[in-house]
C-alpha cells in the first residue's frame, strides 16, 4: 500500500464533521465527489477506490453510479440496500432519538453499544471506537454524531445503483441486516454488476469482528 493516499471521511453529522440542518445521501455523495476531485487536482491521483460500510456503502455506490468516470473500484461492506419499489410510507422510522449528556466520560463510554446489537470479541477495538466517538461540551459528555440526523435523513427511495466499475459486496455471515431474504434480494438486483464475498463468524460490523480479514480482502482486491 505504499504510494497510496488513504482518506478516512467523517460524513456530515458524524465524527468530527459539522452538523447540518438537513441530511441526504445525495449531499453525502457530493461531499465525497468534492474530496475525489480535490485529490485529483492537488495530488494527481488517477486511480480512485471507494470503500464504505453500512450507510457508507450506499454513499459509495451512489458516487460510483452518478460519477462513473471518477471511481475505479467500489467495495460495499454489509450495506442494507432497499429495492427501488420500497415504499417508506408503509414503514415506521421509530421514535426520535433525544440528545443526552453525561456528567463523566467514563459513564458515557459504559453506554457504548453497537447497532444493530451484536456481540464483539475484540474489546480493544470497541474501546478505541467508543473513546473517539464522544466529546465534552458545556452540558457534559455526548456522542459526536448529530442525534437528529437519522430522523431527517433523505434516503435513496426509488433509486437503483448503476455503477459500472469493478465492485465487491462483503457481508457478515451472521449479519442481522442480511438476514431473511435481504441478501438474496440484493444479489438478485446486483449480481450482474457486483461480486459477493461472505466473511464467516462476522455480524453486521464486519470490520470490528474480523479486522484482519477485511484488510486482507481489501488489499487483495485493490492492490
Regions found by a protein language model. Name each.
Residues 52-56, 60:
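Gly/Ala-rich beta-loop-alpha elbow adjacent to hydrolase catalytic centers
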Residues 5-51, 216:
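Active-site loop/oxyanion-hole signature of alpha/beta-hydrolase fold enzymes
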Residues 99, 103-157:
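Conserved alpha/beta-hydrolase catalytic His-Asp/Glu region
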Residues 208-220:
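Post-His helix in hydrolase/transferase enzymes
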Residues 199-211:
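Catalytic histidine-centered segment of alpha/beta-hydrolase-like enzymes
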Amino acid at each position: 500500500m505504499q504510494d497510496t493516499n488513504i482518506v478516512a471521511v467523517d460524513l456530515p453529522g458524524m465524527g468530527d464533521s459539522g452538523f447540518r440542518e438537513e441530511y441526504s445521501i445525495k449531499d453525502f455523495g457530493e461531499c465525497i465527489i468534492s474530496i475525489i476531485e480535490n485529490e485529483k487536482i492537488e495530488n494527481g491521483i488517477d486511480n480512485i477506490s471507494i470503500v464504505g460500510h453500512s450507510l457508507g456503502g450506499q454513499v459509495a455506490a451512489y458516487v460510483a453510479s452518478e460519477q462513473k468516470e471518477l471511481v475505479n473500484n467500489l467495495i460495499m461492506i454489509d450495506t442494507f440496500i432497499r429495492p427501488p419499489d420500497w415504499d417508506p410510507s408503509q414503514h415506521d422510522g421509530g421514535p426520535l432519538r433525544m440528545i443526552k449528556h453525561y456528567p463523566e466520560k467514563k459513564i458515557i463510554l459504559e453506554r457504548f453499544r453497537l447497532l444493530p446489537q451484536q456481540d464483539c470479541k475484540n474489546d480493544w477495538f470497541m474501546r478505541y471506537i467508543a473513546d473517539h466517538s464522544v466529546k465534552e461540551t458545556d452540558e457534559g459528555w455526548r456522542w459526536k454524531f448529530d442525534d437528529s440526523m437519522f430522523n431527517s435523513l433523505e434516503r435513496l427511495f426509488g433509486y437503483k445503483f448503476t455503477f459500472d466499475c469493478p465492485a465487491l459486496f462483503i457481508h457478515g455471515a451472521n449479519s442481522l441486516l442480511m438476514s431473511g431474504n435481504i441478501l438474496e434480494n440484493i444479489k438478485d438486483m446486483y449480481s450482474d454488476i457486483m461480486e459477493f464475498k461472505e466473511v464467516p463468524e462476522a455480524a453486521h460490523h464486519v470490520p470490528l469482528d474480523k479486522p484482519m480479514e477485511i484488510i486482507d480482502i481489501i488489499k487483495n482486491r485493490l492492490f
